[in-house]
Amino acid sequence: MTGKTVTRADLAESVFRKVGLSRTESAELVETVIDEICNAIVRGETVKLSSFATFQVRDKNERIGRNPKTGEEVPISPRRVMTFKASNVLKTRILKAHVSRKVKLKPQNPAP
């Protein structure tokens, strides 16, 4: 892992360099796309970005949990959660990048 976090500014800069919009237009485009995704999720819609991932809101029922320290049963209230499911295309890209990185880092056996 590189430890790098990609920010909105990074995405806007990438749009600026690759698409040719101005920096302001690039930032506005990124914000608009993020806003549309967020609004759809808030409305309870599933957002599917082909070859990337699916964002979905799920309702979770009330259930009984346990306090790990005391073992006491505690009710967990019903709630809505968002799930992110990577597409098979993205999973494959991640795996290939991991494998190629691992091969590059593999120590060479010294010649006899």
UniProtKB/Swiss-Prot annotation:
InterPro entries: Hist_DNA-bd, Histone-like_DNA-bd_CS, IHF-like_DNA-bd_dom_sf, IHF_alpha
One Pfam family recorded for the sequence: Bac_DNA_binding
GO molecular function, one term: structural constituent of chromatin
GO biological process terms on file: DNA recombination; positive regulation of metabolic process; regulation of DNA-templated transcription; regulation of translation
Stretch forming the signal peptide: none
Record carries keyword DNA-binding: yes
Similarity comment text for this entry: Belongs to the bacterial histone-like protein family.
Functional note: This protein is one of the two subunits of integration host factor, a specific DNA-binding protein that functions in genetic recombination as well as in transcriptional and translational control.
Oligomeric form and interacting partners: Heterodimer of an alpha and a beta chain.
Protein name per UniProt: Integration host factor subunit alpha
Organism phylogeny: Bacteria, Pseudomonadati, Pseudomonadota, Alphaproteobacteria, Hyphomicrobiales
